[in-house]
């Protein structure tokens, strides 16, 4: 019979990064300075793609051209419609032995402008918005907001708009009802207290001088936009303007162990995946990092992972080296990098503690996602889970495994199933997030760093 101590050694232990690798904390802090810069510069998918392209160019990546000659060690990249990033390092082995894919998304929940957004009502001018992704509407009023986007003007030129990020810029906001008049609102269920039609962004209150004109405040705002950017009301029809929180990424906690920011979902996985791809040199397998769009709304469309753009890129890589893409896909492995919920002690009733993932305990694996009875998920094979855990153990990565929360409370999906549907072995992995999908999400720096070390080990692995 084994002793008590010997039996305890059989248990699954889920210790913090600080307990297991105290020296890694300083490394995590240093790594996350670059991540915070990425967050502040990349609040939209277009900005994330542009920032990533700068990093790739600085690292010596060349634009990919179908049919170009590719040799081991070459680094190539492609930008899809200004919203997706595809970067590859050609491996020493044939692509017939498979790719190592790190895939994350760079869109985040937000508010978009409607096609005809500008209106005036009772002394104020507003933008009407259409929420994008799974937001909790009550979280968006009474915080500073910024405008980011592009406008394709009627003359064919394109102008970029960013207002609200610099200290000298004006901010924007959405109002809420004062508590003194909130008795009826307080009786409503939480999702109904603030509706989609309440999410109107305040733009201004000064009218033009002509007292006889209609919509004097709307005209005043439109005149300012025309002076600043040369746009008309018609140009909003051909614009993509996003309303995002104006917060900067900030250290959270007296110990500065966490980061609070907008857009951790999923840039907290995208940045480490990209950095691992950039840093790999002469890998055994061809490595590919894909940062995709539209995950928050189902991954459809020409920039979503459910389209063919990413797989066409992989097929073109295969064609350039004379490899059958079907064989390459079947031999490939993919880490689908997306966030999961961090166990929140303030809302412990929503979680199952033994299967929760915790801030500060390392990068999280989740064998499956989905809702209820594992609907709409890619359930990774045990062999793939074993491969990944052995890889992380070999490379000193602190990791944990779990589920999002209590069953039948809800659920969530990732892009893993779209990759797996192309006959590529895929598993979900990511950083646990507190207050996910809120305007100010919180993550542990140690977990971000362990995600990076996982992606780095995966890029370099020869198995």
Regions found by a protein language model. Give the residues of each.
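N-terminal hydrophobic/helix-forming segments and targeting peptides
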Residues: 1-463
């Amino acid at each position: 019979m084994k002793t008590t101590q010997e039996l305890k050694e059989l248990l699954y232990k889920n210790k913090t990064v600080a307990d297991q690798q105290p020296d890694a904390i300083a490394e995590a802090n240093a790594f996350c300075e670059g991540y915070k810069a990425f967050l502040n510069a990349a609040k939209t998918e277009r900005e994330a793609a542009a920032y990533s392209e700068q990093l790739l160019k600085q690292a010596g990546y060349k634009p990919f051209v179908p049919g170009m000659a590719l040799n081991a060690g070459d680094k190539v990249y492609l930008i899809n419609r200004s919203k997706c990033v595809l970067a590859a390092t050609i491996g020493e082995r044939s692509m017939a032995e498979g790719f190592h894919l790190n895939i994350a998304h760079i869109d985040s929940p937000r508010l978009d402008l409607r096609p005809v957004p500008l209106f005036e009502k009772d002394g104020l001018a507003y933008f009407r918005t259409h929420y994008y992704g799974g937001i909790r509407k009550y979280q968006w009023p009474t915080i500073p907001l910024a405008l980011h986007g592009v406008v394709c003007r009627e003359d064919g030129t394109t102008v970029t708009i960013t207002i609200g990020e610099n200290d000298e810029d004006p901010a924007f906001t959405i109002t809420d009802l004062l508590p003194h008049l909130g008795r009826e609102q307080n009786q409503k269920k939480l999702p109904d207290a603030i509706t989609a039609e309440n999410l109107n962004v305040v733009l201004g209150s000064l009218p033009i001088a002509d007292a006889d004109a209609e919509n004097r405040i709307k005209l005043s705002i439109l005149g300012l936009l025309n002076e600043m950017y040369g746009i008309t009301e018609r140009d909003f029809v051909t614009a993509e303007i996003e309303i995002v929180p104006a917060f900067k990424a900030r250290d959270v906690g007296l110990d500065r162990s966490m980061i609070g920011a907008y857009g951790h979902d999923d840039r907290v996985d995208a940045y480490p995946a990209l950095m691992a791809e950039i840093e790999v040199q002469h890998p055994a397998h061809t490595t590919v990092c894909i940062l995709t769009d539209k995950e928050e709304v189902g991954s459809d469309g020409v920039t979503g992972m459910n389209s063919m753009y990413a797989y066409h890129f992989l097929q073109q890589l295969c064609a350039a080296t004379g490899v059958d893409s079907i064989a390459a896909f079947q031999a490939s492995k993919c880490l689908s990098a997306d966030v999961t919920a961090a166990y929140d002690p303030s809302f412990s009733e929503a979680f199952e503690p033994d299967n929760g993932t915790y801030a500060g305990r390392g990068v999280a694996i989740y064998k499956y996602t989905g809702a209820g009875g594992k609907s709409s998920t890619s359930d990774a094979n045990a062999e793939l889970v074993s491969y990944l855990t052995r890889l992380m153990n070999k490379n000193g990565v602190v990791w944990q495994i779990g589920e999002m929360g209590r069953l039948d409370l809800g659920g969530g999906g990732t892009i893993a199933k779209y990759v797996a549907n192309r006959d590529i072995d895929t598993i979900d992995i990511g950083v646990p997030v507190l207050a996910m999908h809120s305007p100010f999400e919180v993550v542990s720096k140690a977990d971000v760093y362990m995600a990076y070390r996982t992606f780095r080990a995966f890029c370099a692995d020869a198995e």
